[in-house]
Amino acid sequence: VALGYVGVLTMRLEMPWVGNLKEKRALVRPVVERLKVRFPLTVARLDGLDAHDWEVIGVATISNDYGWVKETLKMAADYVASEGPYRVTSEETEITMIGEGDLDEDELED
């Protein structure tokens, strides 16, 4: 039995019409900050920080409930896709089981 689940979502955001880093940050930073407030997630800008027309963001969460992790990451992905004038060109979700817990009698009955 798993103690919990760690979920990670990465998304590549592309904005080929953007001409400089300042303009790109003005598009990406607000959605990153809103994700942190709206969902129980850790959010980071992972790649493309020096590129003016694309960036990869990552989000992570942890819980003892697999379904909750999966749904939270899906809601975060949908939110990012709907929020910006950028295009989401790739999205990857990975959920990993962590640890092993002890079974109790209640779990055996489920």
Model-identified regions with their sequence ranges:
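Short, charge-dense linear interaction motifs
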Residues: K74, E107-L108
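C-terminal structural segments of small proteins and small subunits
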Residues: D65-D102
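A structural signal for short, well-ordered beta-strand segments
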Residues: L9-L13, I57-V59, E91-T93
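A short linear hydrophobic-aromatic micro-motif
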Residues: P40-D47, S90
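N-terminal first-folded block
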Residues: A2-R38
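SAM-dependent methyltransferases
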Residues: A2, L108-D110
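Short, charge-patterned binding micro-sites
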Residues: A44-N64
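Short, highly charged C-terminal tails/helix-capping segments
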Residues: L49-W54, T93-E107
